[in-house]
């Protein structure tokens, strides 16, 4: 896939940068399985993080953000902010400044802590934590959270269902 990874999330997340308090320097996000629609399932198998980190965090960010000319990335982000969210030029410029600084940094300053893949996690218990390692980029973890959730939720559900089938096999 050849798309700016910041555009592979809930696009309104791009607006959060300007909504945080100016003095905020630390933000932690969690992935917590909330519940099951299947009777008798009160735990989920944590699975899919390694693939997400390799294909999305490392490969996609390098290929489609850090290794691209920033002007190209800026045009993509600017288009979403202007046409999709109705941002004014002033708001766009402020937001773009954050992305430009991250592009100049050339890596995602985040730390992801999680239970081991394959762990059976009770519903309502966080299985993953994302936090920034650089106060200037406190917002990056939250920007990743939506895509991470979308990317690993299906593998987690599939692994959980597979576990249930193994019980009866």
Which role fits each region the language model picked out?
Residues 1-169:
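Ordered alpha/beta subdomains of enzyme catalytic regions
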């Amino acid at each position: 896939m050849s798309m700016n990874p910041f555009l592979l999330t809930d696009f309104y997340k791009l607006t959060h940068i300007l909504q945080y308090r100016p003095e905020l320097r630390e933000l932690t996000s969690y992935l917590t399985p909330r519940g099951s629609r299947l009777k008798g399932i009160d735990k989920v198998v944590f699975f899919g993080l390694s693939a997400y980190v390799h294909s999305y965090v490392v490969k996609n960010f390098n290929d489609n953000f850090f290794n691209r000319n920033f002007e190209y990335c800026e045009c993509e982000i600017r288009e979403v902010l202007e046409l999709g969210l109705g941002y004014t030029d002033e708001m766009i410029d402020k937001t773009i400044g954050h992305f430009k600084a991250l592009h100049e940094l050339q890596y995602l300053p985040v730390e992801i802590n999680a239970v081991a893949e394959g762990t059976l996690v009770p519903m309502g218990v966080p299985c993953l934590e994302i936090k920034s390692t650089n106060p200037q980029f406190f917002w990056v973890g939250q920007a990743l959270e939506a895509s991470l959730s979308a990317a690993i939720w299906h593998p987690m559900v599939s692994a959980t269902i597979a576990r249930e089938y193994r019980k009866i096999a």
